[in-house]
Design a protein with these regions (language model features):
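Conserved N-terminal phosphate-binding loop of PLP-dependent enzymes in the Aspartate aminotransferase
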Residues: 1-215
Length: 215
């Protein structure tokens, strides 16, 4: 993954993908990039590796989640020699190429292009990250576009408890790590909704910090 979602929204170190490309080329192995969480515009580009390592061309890219816009679909995209490793009929799947899922994927691609959602995700993600970083109790904001990891300060309740409190206020987030809240909202998230979340997060963390100080 160019940005590791379950690890707390952490980017690969600079140069990592370039080194992986060189190692796999030397060994005659495939470089497979997992863009299931980060692909299809989530990072503000079609694929997160386009941002982190623009010169790297993977042999295989895996896609799902955002590709279908809510309709279940997964895809394996192969380039170059890797694309010829499987011939027709060598890999079967009962629902492979499902017409409804494929139509949904095409509609997603058309919508992202037609509504400039890549630009929208990049602009909103950058502005929102700055807002979140200014919240008392937030130590760090990581990620790209609208895949954001909010690193909580030491001494706060576990991120899972904070996420549960936010859910009570109408915001669905999750906590992949004990100190991290992960945000992955729809690309059509409004500026007002983003600001409303920031305000609520600030209130929730302020209450938690106050309770800690009084204990």
């Amino acid at each position: 993954e160019p940005v590791q979602g379950e690890a707390g929204v952490r980017e690969l170190p600079a140069g990592y993908l370039e080194a992986a490309r060189e190692l796999t080329r030397t060994a005659g192995a495939l470089l497979i990039v997992d863009e299931v969480q980060t692909g299809m515009g989530r990072s503000g580009a079609w694929m997160a590796h386009h941002l982190l390592a623009p010169g790297v061309v993977p042999d295989v890219v895996t896609l799902a989640k955002g590709l279908g816009g809510g309709i279940p679909i997964g895809a394996v995209v192969a380039t170059g020699e890797a694309a010829s490793l499987l011939g027709p009929g060598q890999h079967g799947t009962t629902f492979g190429g499902n017409p409804v899922a494929c139509a949904a994927a095409l509609a997603v691609i058309d919508t992202i292009r037609g509504q400039d959602l890549l630009g929208r995700v990049e602009r909103l993600g950058s502005a929102w990250a700055r807002e979140l970083l200014a919240v008392d109790g937030v130590d760090e904001v990581r990620g790209r576009g609208l895949l954001i990891g909010v690193g909580l300060a030491a001494g706060l309740p576990p991120a899972g408890e904070i996420a549960a409190t936010l859910a009570e206020h109408g915001f669905i987030v999750n906590a992949p790590r004990p100190d991290t809240i992960r945000l992955a909202p729809p690309f059509i998230l409004s500026d007002d909704d983003a600001s409303a979340f920031t305000t609520t997060l600030s209130e929730v963390l302020a209450r938690a910090l106050s309770e800690k100080a009084g204990s």
